[in-house]
Curated annotation (Swiss-Prot):
<keyword id="KW-0813">Transport</keyword>
<dbReference type="GO" id="GO:0005886">
    <property type="term" value="C:plasma membrane"/>
</dbReference>
<comment type="function">
    <text>Channel that opens in response to stretch forces in the membrane lipid bilayer. May participate in the regulation of osmotic pressure changes within the cell.</text>
</comment>
<feature type="transmembrane region" description="Helical">
    <location>
        <begin position="14"/>
        <end position="34"/>
    </location>
</feature>
<keyword id="KW-1133">Transmembrane helix</keyword>
<dbReference type="InterPro" id="IPR019823">
    <property type="entry name" value="Mechanosensitive_channel_CS"/>
</dbReference>
<keyword id="KW-0997">Cell inner membrane</keyword>
<dbReference type="InterPro" id="IPR001185">
    <property type="entry name" value="MS_channel"/>
</dbReference>
<dbReference type="InterPro" id="IPR037673">
    <property type="entry name" value="MSC/AndL"/>
</dbReference>
<protein>
    <recommendedName>
        <fullName>Large-conductance mechanosensitive channel</fullName>
    </recommendedName>
</protein>
<keyword id="KW-1003">Cell membrane</keyword>
<feature type="transmembrane region" description="Helical">
    <location>
        <begin position="38"/>
        <end position="58"/>
    </location>
</feature>
<comment type="subunit">
    <text>Homopentamer.</text>
</comment>
<dbReference type="InterPro" id="IPR036019">
    <property type="entry name" value="MscL_channel"/>
</dbReference>
<feature type="transmembrane region" description="Helical">
    <location>
        <begin position="81"/>
        <end position="101"/>
    </location>
</feature>
<dbReference type="GO" id="GO:0008381">
    <property type="term" value="F:mechanosensitive monoatomic ion channel activity"/>
</dbReference>
<keyword id="KW-0472">Membrane</keyword>
């Protein structure tokens, strides 16, 4: 059973999946930075300078802080702003992945169409076969006596 597991892990598909997960994790960081550092400040500037990540509702009377980090130290909070930020991250990531998959599928379909459209040319027959074909044709045209 251990050998089967080793064979399974060593197969290309599992290794490809592992690489994909690692790259996906790194890509997630890029998307998070895109949202947090570029998109959310623009949204904040357009809609009056607010930042979703600090939006929360206190769930106890002891919470009176103005920032989410301080409010979490004081007690329970409903941090809906953090959820909105994560939701925006997800939507951007899903959109980018959709566009990538759509592009790959379009390229595959185009390659398949080109392969179907291009007639498969047979290589010319060897010289001896061409010579024998010419002799056969000459003999066939010769009058029989």
């Amino acid at each position: 059973m251990l050998n089967e597991f080793k064979a399974f892990i060593a197969r290309g598909n599992v290794m490809d999946l592992a690489v994909g997960v690692i790259i996906g994790g790194a890509f997630g960081g890029i998307v998070k930075s895109l949202v947090d550092d570029l998109i959310m400040p623009i949204v904040g500037a357009i809609f009056g300078g607010f930042d979703f990540s600090n939006y929360f509702l206190p769930l106890s009377a002891a919470v009176n802080a103005q920032s989410l980090a301080a409010a979490r130290e004081q007690g329970a909070v409903f941090a809906y702003g953090s959820f909105l930020t994560v939701l925006i991250n997800f939507l951007i990531l899903a959109w980018i992945i959709f566009l990538m998959v759509k592009g790959v599928n379009t390229m595959r379909a185009q390659i398949e169409r080109q392969e179907k459209a291009a007639p498969e040319e047979l290589p010319p027959p060897p010289a001896d076969v061409q010579l024998l074909t010419e002799i056969r044709d000459l003999l066939a045209r010769r009058p029989t006596a």
